[in-house]
């Protein structure tokens, strides 16, 4: 039996909150992907919880996103909604906040960047990107992975 939440005001928005409300351990939560409708694996449930993404509701049922759809729709989002890129110092002056106080997600896997990852952008002179009204960069895992991928050539 899947959990159903009729009242939008009472809907848990995070996996941790859903786990508490249903009194089910995180490992036993069974959720479907909002895009492909496949059931998430345990690893995907944990990954979703670690990225601090919010649950979405369709017909009063909670949905998350699987890894394949997350990577695919993150790329679509990047291409459709990219606005501009800035260096860390410029981002701080634009927002009037320090980088450590800003929520900056990885543009690829959507995990929140740690203070160390934000500092690495500054040290390596890598830019942050405004995509769909949110600031993004690269987490260390995606940074390493994309540095191994062949670059697109321009002809």
Curated annotation (Swiss-Prot):
GO terms for biological process: DNA-templated transcription; regulation of DNA-templated transcription; symbiont-mediated perturbation of host apoptosis; symbiont-mediated perturbation of host ubiquitin-like protein modification; symbiont-mediated suppression of host innate immune response; symbiont-mediated suppression of host type I interferon-mediated signaling pathway. Pfam families: E6. A zinc finger (unnamed) spans 33-69, 106-142. Keywords: Activator, DNA-binding, Early protein, Host cytoplasm, Host nucleus, Host-virus interaction, Inhibition of host innate immune response by virus, Metal-binding, Modulation of host cell apoptosis by virus, Transcription, Transcription regulation, Viral immunoevasion, Zinc, Zinc-finger. It is found in: Host cytoplasm; Host nucleus. GO terms for molecular function: DNA binding; zinc ion binding. One of its GO terms (cellular component) is host cell cytoplasm. InterPro entries: E6, E6_sf. Disulfide bonds: none annotated. Coiled coil: none annotated. Belongs to the low risk human alphapapillomavirus family. The cancer-causing human papillomavirus E6 protein has a unique carboxy terminal PDZ domain containing substrate but low risk E6s do not possess this domain. This protein has transforming activity in vitro. Plays a major role in the induction and maintenance of cellular transformation. E6 associates with host UBE3A/E6-AP ubiquitin-protein ligase and modulates its activity. Sequesters tumor suppressor TP53 in the host cytoplasm and modulates its activity by interacting with host EP300 that results in the reduction of TP53 acetylation and activation. In turn, apoptosis induced by DNA damage is inhibited. E6 also protects host keratinocytes from apoptosis by mediating the degradation of host BAK1. May also inhibit host immune response. Belongs to the papillomaviridae E6 protein family. Forms homodimers. Interacts with ubiquitin-protein ligase UBE3A/E6-AP; this interaction stimulates UBE3A ubiquitin activity. Interacts with host TP53 and EP300; this interaction inhibits TP53 activity. HAMAP family: HPV_E6. This is Protein E6.
């Amino acid at each position: 039996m899947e959990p159903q939440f009729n009242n939008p005001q009472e809907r848990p928005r995070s996996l941790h909150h859903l786990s508490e409300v249903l009194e089910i351990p995180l490992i036993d939560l069974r959720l479907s992907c909002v895009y492909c409708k496949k059931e998430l694996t345990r690893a995907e449930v944990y990954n979703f919880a670690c990225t601090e993404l919010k649950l979405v509701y369709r017909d009063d049922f909670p949905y998350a996103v699987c890894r394949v759809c997350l990577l695919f729709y993150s790329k679509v989002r990047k291409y459709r909604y990219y606005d501009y890129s800035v260096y860390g110092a410029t981002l701080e002056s634009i927002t009037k906040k320090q980088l450590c106080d800003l929520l900056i997600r990885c543009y690829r896997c959507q995990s929140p960047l740690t203070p160390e990852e934000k500092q690495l952008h500054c040290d390596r002179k890598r830019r942050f990107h405004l995509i769909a009204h949110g600031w993004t960069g690269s987490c260390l895992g995606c940074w390493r992975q994309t540095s191994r991928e062949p670059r697109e050539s321009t002809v």
